[in-house]
Amino acid sequence: MNTFEINRVLERFDVDPDRGFLPPEDPLERMPARWSAWDQLGSDLSALIAIGTARRAIRELPDVDTDDLRNPAELRRAMLLLSVFGNAHVFCEPDPGLRLPAGLCRAWNAVANRLERPMIIAHASIVLHNWRRLDPSGPIVAENLRALQCFRGGPDEEWFYLLTAEIEATGARALPALVGLRLAIDRNRHDGVAEHLDHVSETILEMTRVLERMEERCRHAVFYRRIRPFLSGWPEPGVVYEGIDSEPVTLHGGSAAQSSLLNAFDAALSVPHEHPGTRPFLQAMRRYMPPRHRRFIEWLEEGDSLRTVVEDDGRLAARYDECIDGLVRFRRTHQQITMRYITGQAPDRDRAIGTGGTDYADFLRRTRIETSDRRLH
C-alpha cells in the first residue's frame, strides 16, 4: 500500500498522517471578538477559583449566539472553554454547583451538538485541543508546549495535559501503519505486514517512555487534590443544564479511555475487551471522542483479524507478540503510575475512583490481562 492510499483513508476519518488525533493545525488560541468574554473568563478562571468567585462569574456570562461559529478550530476552542467553565462551575466550591446556568448551557449545547459530543470535559478538549507551541516550528513535545486553559493552573496541571498530548503526538507515528495493516489483510497481501508491525511496536515503546516521565513535573498530591476533582464526571443525582433539560444528567468525566489512540491499537491488533468490567465502559467512552475518530476505530475493527492472519507465520507471529508485549508494558506502566496518583493519595479505598468514575484499578488490571491474553506464543 502506498502512502497516498493510506493518507486517503486517514483523511476520511479526520486523522492527520503526522499528528494523528491531534488537530492538523495548532489549536486556536483566542476566539473571534464576538466571543471575547469567553477568552477573558478563561484567562481569569484560576484566580477566580482561588478567591471563590468563579461560580458567580460563570453564571454572569453573557448569553451569546453561536450560529456563526462554523470553523472547526473555533468550535473546538469554544468546546474547550465552555467545558472547562461547566466543570469549574460544578467543582470550584465545596458544595457542587449542580445546576448549570442557562447562558452557559445554551451556547455549550449548540457547540456540543455540532461536534457530536456530550456537554462535559473530555480528553478531546483538555488534551487534544489545549496546547500551543512555544517555538512554532518546534516539535509537539511537552517542553515546547503551554496549555491554553487550566482550572487552578500551575506547572503540575499543565504538565499533566501536555505530556499526555506528547503521548498522542508520539503514537500518531503508528497510525499509518495500522491503516497499512488493515489494507494489507483486506487484499491478502502480506508482504508489508512485518514492517508495519515493527513500526507499531517501536512506537508503543516510545509512548511508554514518554508516559514514564509523568511524575517528573506532576506531583501526586497536587494531582489528587487540585487537578483530579475538576476532571470528574456527573454522578448521581446528576447535573441540570438549565434552559436545555429540566431533568438531571449523569455523565462520565475525563478519562484516558477516551483517547482514540489506545483504542485504535486494540482494534488493529485484534485485542477485544469482552469482560463485563471493561467492555461497557470502553464502549461508553467512544461517545466522548470526536465522531470521525470513533468511526476510525470501528473501521479498524471491521477488518479481518490480524491475529488470525499472522498466527501460522512464525516470523509475523513473533512481531505481533512484540506489539502485544508493548501494549502490556504501556498498560502496566499506566496502572502503576495511576496507583501512585490516586490510591496512594486517597484517604480510604472507597474514594480511590478514577476521573471517569470507574474502579480504575480493577479496570486497568483487566484491560492489561485481556491484552496479554492475545499473545500467540
Question: What name fits each language-model region?
Answer:
Residues 1-377:
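Surface-exposed peri-terminal alpha-helical interaction modules
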